[in-house]
């Protein structure tokens, strides 16, 4: 089913205010923090990136993701449309094959790994919403030899509020 998502950046001062607010409002920890590693795919023109920056819909993100540095990877497509966002996810066994050959997408053509993002994610639940908070965000550029090279460490935090696509306001 489609869902709504609101994402925003927080600096250290705003982070403290945000954490105080969600605790005061009764948000509860959903489960333990996890390290999230995502490898994002795009075509040579970086069309998915540009569509995202420009807010074009429909659009999608294609990524491989794993948690806590285990060897189990998920292949995900996240579609944004007028109705909201929708994600498909399936376990993959041929990690190296997808990294080397890429993924042929009907909308964007051949997509290869472009960037790896790694961060520590905290999870909360509040009313019918799920809140995630990402910190220690590191970006790595994917190289032609399929390795990743450190590119940037983000000093900010990213919070996201996710809920079912209903009339209930965030």
Predicted regions, residues:
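Phosphate-end processing signature that detects enzymes handling 5′-triphosphorylated RNA
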Residues: 1-170
């Amino acid at each position: 089913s489609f869902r709504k998502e609101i994402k925003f950046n927080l600096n250290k001062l705003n982070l403290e205010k945000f954490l105080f607010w969600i605790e005061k409002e009764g948000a509860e920890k959903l489960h333990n923090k996890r390290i999230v590693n995502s490898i994002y795919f795009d075509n040579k023109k970086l069309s998915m990136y540009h569509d995202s920056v420009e807010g074009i819909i429909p659009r999608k993100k294609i990524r491989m993701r794993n948690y806590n540095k285990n060897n189990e990877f998920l292949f995900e497509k996240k579609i944004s449309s007028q109705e909201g966002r929708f994600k498909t996810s399936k376990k993959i066994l041929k990690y190296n094959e997808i990294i080397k050959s890429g993924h042929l997408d009907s909308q964007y053509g051949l997509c290869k790994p472009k960037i790896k993002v790694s961060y520590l994610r905290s999870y909360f639940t509040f009313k019918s919403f799920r809140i995630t908070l990402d910190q220690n965000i590191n970006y790595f550029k994917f190289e032609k030899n399929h390795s990743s090279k450190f590119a940037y460490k983000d000093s900010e935090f990213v919070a996201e509020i996710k809920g079912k696509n209903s009339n209930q306001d965030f």
